[in-house]
């Protein structure tokens, strides 16, 4: 059995889950903590929403929201068209869980499982950095929503 490559991180945010949810699902905020294509529509992301990036090698990187439980959980499947092995939808994903803690929200982030794909360690390492950086921006944006 291959060791799982799942990034796990969390942060306590001094804002309620409604504000954190807005930062996770509104493109104007997402663009500050993640990349969006230039022409992405300014509609809230919901279950079924997709973001498609054209890759320099001719492939596509596609993210699709496969679960959206408002103010509780957001699961975004990742698929890259030129991966040699195609995992099942959702087996490689970004998962954001929100838990109310009084006036604050605990945001738990899980990204992976990258052991299912070739060069998974490279994706894992990049995702460790992404989780660390993005959680700080999500915290700042959520706490400044007022």
Task: Give names to the regions the model predicted.
Residues 4, 56-58:
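Glycine-centered tight beta-turn/hairpin loop motif at sheet-sheet or coil-to-beta transitions
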Residues 7-11, 96, 109-111:
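A structural signal for short, well-ordered beta-strand segments
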Residues 10-12, 52-54, 64, 97:
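Generic structural detector for well-ordered beta-strands
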Residues 59-104, 112:
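Hydrophobic-ligand binding "helix-grip"
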């Amino acid at each position: 059995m291959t060791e799982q490559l799942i990034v796990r991180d969390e942060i306590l945010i001094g804002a309620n889950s409604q504000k954190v949810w807005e930062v996770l699902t509104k493109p104007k905020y997402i663009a500050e903590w993640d990349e969006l294509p230039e022409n992405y529509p300014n509609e809230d992301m919901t279950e079924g929403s997709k973001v498609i990036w054209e890759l320099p090698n001719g492939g596509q990187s596609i993210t699709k929201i496969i679960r959206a439980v408002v103010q509780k959980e957001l699961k975004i499947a990742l698929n890259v068209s030129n991966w040699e092995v195609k995992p099942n939808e959702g087996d490689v994903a970004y998962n954001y869980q929100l838990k109310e803690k009084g006036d604050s929200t605990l945001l738990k982030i899980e990204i992976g499982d990258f052991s299912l794909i070739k060069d998974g360690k490279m994706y894992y390492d990049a995702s460790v950095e992404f989780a660390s950086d993005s959680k700080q921006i999500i915290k700042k944006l959520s706490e400044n929503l007022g």
